[in-house]
Structures are given as structure tokens and as C-alpha cells.
Amino acid sequence: MKISRDAYANMYGPTVGDRIRLGDTELWIEIEKDHTHYGEEVVFGGGKVIRDGMGQSQLCSDSVMDTVITNVIIIDWWGIVKADVGLKDGRIVAIGKAGNPDTQPDVDIIIGAGTEIIAGENQILTAGAVDTHVHYICPQQVDEALMSGLTTMIGGGTGPATGSVATTNTPGPWHIGKMMQAVDDLPINIGFLGKGSASTPAALEEQVKAGVMSLKVHEDWAATPATIGNALDVADRYDIQVALHADSLNESGFVKDTLEAFKDRCIHSYHTEGAGGGHAPDIIVACGQPNVLPSSTNPTRPYTINTVDEHLDMLMECHHLDPNIPEDVAFADSRIRRETIAAEDILHDLGAISMISSDSQAMGRIGEVVCRTWQTAHKMRLQRGLLPEDQERGTDNFRVKRYIAKYTINPAITHGVSHEVGSVEIGKMADLVLWRPKFFGVKPSIILKGGMIAGAAMGDPNAAISTPQPVHYRRMFGALGRAVSATRVTFVSQAAMDTGLEEKLGLRSRLVACKNVRSMRKKDMKLNDYCPNITVDPETYEVRVDGVLLTCEPLSELPLAQLYHLF
């Protein structure tokens, strides 16, 4: 029997060779592999396949999946494929062909009476996003994050305190303990950054043992070579990461001095373009270092006609600056440079900047990590055409895989949590996001947290069916009651785990230790490991890679924007 591609896609979703447009961007993907079998696809519904004795087996719960996502398109750093995905005990346990082995061939994901089905036909599945630059200013950020497709937040803060508004630190054992208790019932994975700005180790070590998973060195608290070196010494002892907001004013040294303070050790460089902070005007050269894991924050993503104007007021507010003090205004002006922001776009497209994060409520928007990433990819597709790796296929598969790695696997690797989150891979937590292609990157359909639906675009709860307007993002059952603590984790150091912190603080959520952090290098950043020789002209701020000028024009119109939002 033969069937047209259109008819097949309508029933079972696209297959190998079919192309899909992502939202209203100029990005197109092509299915690389199909794990399902033609003629044996499992579909739920009246008169469909997943019924007793057909696609549903007689096996009990110990042998079948808790949930199967059928015929879904997976986009991840490792590939763009179509498959059935099996979830059990809150984890991804299989990617392949679902069904009933008694009636169908080559089934490796068994459906039974104990299995729930999520129809993935004509939908895209991605890993939940990992945001590694979150200012914990208000708990309501969690809903904004979750409903945009984020499932892990790593950052610091204690609420709208002046220090937290400016810097991503949760300082000291008392605050760390209280914040760990506060997030215990929030439906998202959380990790805390301690205050790393100290020139002796004791005050940092007590924070590591109290529960932080990384240290943050910030210029507002001091980012001197001494504080950087001390934080890295402590990190080396406890196998944790150091995140750096470097010295914008060049008070204690220049970018060369900061790079020397690293002593070739692994470090996460925040907003490495510099508008968010860091040596003016040339912190961006850190992207070329093999030990530096560089990230961007989303307010400069991508470069548009409004980017520069928006930043000045944001900067004054976030860093407690006074517009009546000339030195404060000069400080703000020194950080906002069209030339480095334009170069940042291209460095992302080259794979020289490895991650994108938010800088939530402190110059960035937590609900826009995902959409700003794809807007950047779209801009580069328009301005730079197909990447060399995509020329043969003629679609944007490699570029899409490069960009999705920036907010999933690479931040997870950087902070030592990729054994739990960051990709659609067997054994990891089932923190997954479903998207309809026309809403990809901007409005997810369903957000799963630890295998349970925690958020969704849901219609009127009083309607006869679930789809009528008004459709809002709402918390689902996975975000309520004891299910929350059973499907989320708090990331800590192994040293904190060894103190019995869980029992001491009375936590219900599982604690998970970060690991394999200090051995990471730029070469470990998936599809984003380019280490170019970068120079910045101190007078004109022009950025060059291997002598070639990096520049591009700002866009006046973006996808994934007004078309999808009333406001």
C-alpha cells in the first residue's frame, strides 16, 4: 500500500526527508531518521491503533511505560529524528518504536493498560531549557520560566534585596538554607550560586557546604584577580563551577589580568559580550580561551534597532546607579557598545559563544531565553545564509542543533548537571517540552516536569472541551501538591550532600550533587566549541576574528514576536 506524503504527515506526522518550518522564522529542519515503522505506527483515538489486543499489550506496569509520546519529532544537539519516546518513573527510558510486541515487530517501548499516551504527531519535542543566570528576585519567575519551556534554573538571590537585584548571589549559610526551603515546592529544578567575592577561602567553603552548587564572582562585590583566584581554588577543591561577572571599570586590572588569574582553569564567563558587565570594551576576547565557557544573556539577543536604547535605563536601574552622577552615567555608557553586540550575533553563529541565559529581572527576561535564541538563529540565517555544515542538505539542521545546545546541554555540562538534565537522552529526568511547529520557540503546548505534565496551554476550564478560548498557560497537576517535590530536584555540591543537608533542612525534594565540573573545557561544549583569536579595537570597539571584521546590521523586525502576542 502506498500513501502520499501529505496524507501520511496528517495522520502520523512528517517522516524522513520531510521539512518543517520553525515558527515564523526562516529556519527549516529535515527529519534525519524515523524510528517508527511504516504501517505499524501507534496512534491513540477512536478506531485507532492503541487498543487492547492491537497496539496495547496485556503486560503489567512493571513491563510497560508510564507514558509514551507517539510519533514525535525530537530536536536535540545530537539529532533531528522522529520516534516514540517512553517515560517511566519520571525518566526517559526509551527512544524508538512503541507498541505491542505480541502483535507488532521490533517493539522496544511497550504500551499496556498502565500507560498514558501523549500524541506527538506533528509536534516537536525538546529538552527543558536550563537557565544558568537567574536572579532570584521573585518566586513568580518560576511560572514565567516554566511556561516558556524552562525546567531548570541556576542562579542566586534572596528576593528583591538590593544585592540580589544586581548580583546573582545567595550569600551565607542562613540565606542558603532558607532559600532551599523556599524552593522545595516550586515545580522547577533549582541550583544556587554563593557569593564568591572573597580573598580567603573560609567564607566560600561554608557556603559550598551549606548547599550552593557554584560560586559567583561579581564586580559589584569585587572581581579582582585575588577574588577570582580564591574562588577557583575553592571550586577546584569541591568540584563546582565559578561564574564570573568581570570588572567593567578595569579597576583592579584589565582583561589580560583576569585571564591570567584563571591560570588555565575552567570558568563560566557570564554575558561575555560585555553589555551585562565585564572588562570594557574587550571582555569578549574571553570567547577565544580554551578554558573559558562563555555565555550570553538575552537582552542583547539578537542585535536590533532597539537594543542599545533599551540597555541604558536597564543598566542604571539594575546596578543602583544615579543618573545625576556623571561617573555613573559614564560607567553605563562604557558597557553598551553596538560593535560588540553585533559581533556577538556572529560569534554565536560560529559556535564561539556556547550558551544563552536570561539575567532575569536584572537586565534580562526569564521567559524569553528560548525565543531570543531562535530569533538570533533566524537573524543569522537571513544575514549569513546556510552554514557550511548545512550546504549539502539545504536546510538548517546543523544550525538548529547548534542553537538548541546553547540553552540545554551546554549549560547543563557547564554546571555539572548533564547527568540529570539538558537533553532528550535515555536515563535523564523527563523534563520535556512539546511544541506545535508553528508555535516553536515561543509558545509550548505541554511542559513535562519529571515525567508529569506541570504546565500547558489550556482553554476555558468551564468549557465542554479543553480547547476553547481563552487559552492561558496554567499550572497542571504536576505542579501541585506532593507531586512537585517528587518530580523536581535541587542541585548542590557533593560536600553539601555529605553533611546530611536534606534531613537537616527538612526538605522533601531530592538533592542531586553536581559533578565532573572542573575537568570541563571549551572543547566539551556541544557544537559550540570554536576558540578563535579575537581582538577589539580600544578606540572604535570593532571586533575582529583572525583579523576579519565581525559586524552585521540590526534587524527592525523579528519573528516569534508581535505575530504571537497581543502586547
UniProtKB/Swiss-Prot annotation:
Q: Which pathway does this polypeptide act in?
A: Nitrogen metabolism; urea degradation; CO(2) and NH(3) from urea (urease route): step 1/1
User: What positions does the entry give for Ni(2+) 1 binding?
Assistant: H133, H135, K216, D359
Indicate the segments forming the Urease domain, all copies. Answer: 128-567
Presence of the UniProt keyword Amino-acid biosynthesis in the record = no
Q: How does it get modified post-translation? A: Carboxylation allows a single lysine to coordinate two nickel ions.
**What SUPFAM superfamilies does the record point to?**
Composite domain of metallo-dependent hydrolases, Metallo-dependent hydrolases
Where does this protein hold Ni(2+) 2?
A: K216, H245, H271
Name the reaction it catalyses.
urea + 2 H2O + H(+) = hydrogencarbonate + 2 NH4(+)
Per its Swiss-Prot or TrEMBL entry, what cofactor is needed?
Ni cation
Could you confirm whether the keyword DNA repair appears in this record? Answer: no
What residues form the catalytic site here?
H319 (proton donor)
Give the EC number(s) under which this enzyme is classified: 3.5.1.5
Cellular location of this protein?
Cytoplasm
Q: Which residues carry this modification: N6-carboxylysine?
A: K216
- GO BP of this protein: urea catabolic process
Cofactor details (free text): Binds 2 nickel ions per subunit.
- A GO term, aspect molecular function: urease activity
Q: Which UniProt keywords apply?
A: Cytoplasm, Hydrolase, Metal-binding, Nickel
Q: Name one GO cellular component term.
A: cytoplasm
Give the UniProt family note.
Belongs to the metallo-dependent hydrolases superfamily. Urease alpha subunit family.
Subunit record text: Heterotrimer of UreA (gamma), UreB (beta) and UreC (alpha) subunits. Three heterotrimers associate to form the active enzyme.
| Name of protein | Urease subunit alpha 1
Q: Which organism is it from?
A: Psychrobacter cryohalolentis (strain ATCC BAA-1226 / DSM 17306 / VKM B-2378 / K5)
Q: What is the lineage of its organism?
A: Bacteria, Pseudomonadati, Pseudomonadota, Gammaproteobacteria, Moraxellales
